[in-house]
């Protein structure tokens, strides 16, 4: 089960109703209250929260979700599909997607989003015929992203990830984690506290600041 705060998409009837003040929008306090209510309801039905917005019964957590939150590479196929690969997979990626060209020298991770429309994709299904929005991340950016995603997991940021990040970020990482712990966003185990869960944007934003050095 996934539980997310309401997102109002531009151009929808809902957005027009909000703009015309015909539909109320919950504020941050309302959203936090609803998240806590959903957590209590799902917990009473045997569901445990394993990620900020994801719940499952014991042993039934979604493996693709866990792969995404822990930085494991994944391939998405079709219009709008997203993919992510590490630098060690670039050579294989180049053979399947020659249109991407050579990545920047400092790239450690690549994110792809397929922009090919359905009609063209049906007529030209080969991977080499597809178009993508491409984003390259440096090693430091990749580690900051993994720290941010790790903080979304109920089990928290792993010691192995902290060790890898410290090799690149040094004392900046320790200072950031100490600050987040002192401000009660993270527990000593580096798992998100209830405050960190409800005020996730602050927690993730401060971790992402490590990406710029």
Question: Which role fits each region the language model picked out?
Answer:
Residues 195-213:
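Short, amphipathic alpha-helical interaction segments positioned at domain boundaries
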Residues 181-190:
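A short, conserved structural fragment
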Residues 156-157, 186, 213:
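Intrinsically disordered or highly flexible coil/loop and linker segments, enriched in small
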Residues 38-42, 180, 203:
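Hydrophobic alpha-helical packing residues
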Residues 166-181:
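Short amphipathic alpha-helical interaction segments
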Residues 141-148, 174, 197, 201:
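Non-catalytic, well-ordered alpha-helical scaffold segments
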Residues 1-167:
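C-terminal scaffold of the Radical SAM
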